[in-house]
C-alpha cells in the first residue's frame, strides 16, 4: 500500500471508530462490537487502491473480496465495498460501519479531516474536468450532506463542526 493511502486510511479509521464509539456512548446502538468493526473497515477501506492504480479495476470491489477471503468478515467487507457509493435510498438507521466509513472517507482529504464543503471543493478542482464528472461530484456531495445530517441527529452531535482527538469526536469550533 502506498504510504499516502495508508495515512489516509488511518485518518478514515480514526473518524469511523469515533463515530461508532459515540453511537455506543449515546445508546444509538447496543452493539459495542461496532467500534472494532468500524476501525477495521476504516483501516481496510482502500486496501486495494495501490493495486488498482497499477493494474486497474475497482478498488472497492477488489478490496472487499480480499477482506472476505482473508478474514471472512462480511460486515467489514460490506463497508469496504460500499465506501465509494451507496447506490440505494438511505435506510432510516445509519448507525453501521458502512455509513461510518462512507462519511469518514468523504471528510478525509488525504490525511486530514476537513468539512464536506472543503473536501468536495477539492474534488471539483482535482477531478471536475467535465460536466459529467462535476455532476457526479455534486451528487456525492449532496448524498454526503444527507448522511452527515442524519448521523448528526442519531449520534446527537453536530458532525459538521467535528474532528477527532484522542479517539473521540470533538468540536472544531
Annotated model-derived regions:
Residues 1-30, 44, 72-74, 85-173:
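Divalent metal-dependent phosphate-bond-processing catalytic cores, especially two-metal-ion Mg2+/Mn2+ enzymes
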Residues 12, 31-67, 79-87:
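His-Asp-centered metal-binding catalytic motifs of divalent-metal-dependent phosphohydrolases/nucleases
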Amino acid at each position: 500500500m502506498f504510504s499516502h493511502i495508508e495515512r489516509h486510511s488511518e485518518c478514515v479509521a480514526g473518524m469511523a471508530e469515533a463515530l461508532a464509539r459515540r453511537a455506543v456512548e449515546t445508546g444509538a446502538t447496543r452493539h459495542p462490537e461496532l467500534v472494532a468493526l468500524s476501525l477495521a473497515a476504516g483501516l481496510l477501506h482502500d486496501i486495494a487502491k495501490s493495486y488498482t492504480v497499477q493494474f486497474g479495476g475497482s478498488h472497492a470491489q477488489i478490496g472487499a473480496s480480499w477482506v472476505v477471503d482473508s478474514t471472512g468478515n462480511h460486515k467489514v467487507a460490506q463497508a469496504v465495498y460500499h465506501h465509494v457509493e451507496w447506490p440505494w435510498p438511505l435506510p432510516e438507521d445509519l448507525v453501521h460501519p458502512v455509513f461510518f466509513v462512507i462519511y469518514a472517507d468523504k471528510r478525509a482529504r488525504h490525511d486530514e479531516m476537513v468539512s464536506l464543503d472543503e473536501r468536495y471543493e477539492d474534488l471539483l478542482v482535482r477531478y471536475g474536468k467535465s460536466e459529467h464528472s462535476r455532476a457526479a461530484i455534486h451528487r456525492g456531495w449532496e448524498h454526503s450532506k444527507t448522511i452527515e445530517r442524519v448521523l448528526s441527529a442519531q449520534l446527537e452531535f453536530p458532525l459538521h463542526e467535528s474532528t477527532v482527538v484522542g479517539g473521540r469526536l470533538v468540536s472544531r469550533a
